A protein has these predicted regions:
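A structural signal for short loop-to-beta-strand junctions that line the ligand-binding cleft
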Residues: 1-18, 39-43, 145-152
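Flexible hinge/capping segments at coil-to-helix
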Residues: 23-37
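Short helix-initiation/N-cap motifs at beta->coil->alpha
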Residues: 29, 96-109, 120
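Hydrophobic residues within well-ordered alpha-helices
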Residues: 34-35, 54, 105-110
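Glycine-centered hinge/linker elements that transmit conformational signals in sensory
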Residues: 68-99
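Paired acidic/hydrophobic, glycine-rich loop segments that form the ligand-binding mouth/hinge
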Residues: 113-118, 134-136
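Extracytoplasmic/periplasmic substrate-recognition and gating elements
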Residues: 127-191
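Long, aromatic- and glycine/proline-rich binding clefts that accommodate carbohydrate-like moieties
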Residues: 188-201
Length: 201
């Protein structure tokens, strides 16, 4: 408390990119609807992403995310229902596991119509989709007849300073500048790196 650990400079989460020529504004609200209308790629073998389904059905990591004593609750009926959903998902011919760049490669050649990633892939997706470039919040999915909201991890990337360096105050000043409002705006303008500074967002 009341300590500086690092200087945040961008968000670190993920969302959905999609081809607007394939999916309507209503389609993108439901993962299951999207799977019925086009090819959807999701990084199912990546644990940073797969938890979105479990969290969406009520499984928790440290309670609300801040209660270490609450531990991890990814068991029981809620988790089993999601696991069964994912088994069926893998068998769906319109689903493609996004590994080794399969998602963006598929957007480029038209074999994929939606992927799940973060701002780091914005330029590549925009290049692949052109005027059909769409970005949206995560959709819902249906488990045992219940509509569940996918939930991604939310965090930030930050600039840290070694407290044992020769000039820690100068290093902290540099880190503060590099993560400041002006620098974050420049990163967004030049490289599409989304800012964490609320004066910009």
């Amino acid at each position: 408390k009341d300590s500086v650990y690092a200087f945040p400079f961008t968000s670190n989460t993920w969302f959905m990119y999609y081809d607007k020529s394939v999916f309507t504004d209503d389609d993108i609200k439901s993962f299951d609807t999207m799977l019925s209308k086009g090819k959807v790629s999701f990084p199912l073998s990546n644990s940073w992403y797969i938890q979105a389904f479990y969290a969406g059905n009520g499984c928790t990591l440290f309670g609300d995310g801040t209660d270490e004593a609450a531990g991890i609750d990814f068991g029981g009926d809620k988790a089993a229902a999601v696991t069964n959903y994912l088994v069926d998902l893998v068998a769906n011919p319109n689903f493609i596991n996004d590994q080794d760049g399969a998602g963006i490669a598929g957007l480029r050649d038209g074999s994929v119509n939606a992927i799940f990633s973060g701002s780091w892939d914005a330029a590549s997706v925009k290049e692949a989709l052109g005027d059909n470039y769409g970005v949206a919040a995560l959709p819902t999915f249906t488990v045992d007849g219940n509509e569940c909201q996918m939930k991604s991890f939310a965090g930030s990337k930050a600039i840290g300073v070694n407290p044992n360096c020769e000039n820690p105050q100068i290093a902290m000043s540099l880190a503060a500048y590099l993560s400041g409002e002006e620098a974050q705006q420049a990163h967004y303008d030049e490289r599409n790196i989304l800012p964490s500074n609320t004066n910009i967002t």
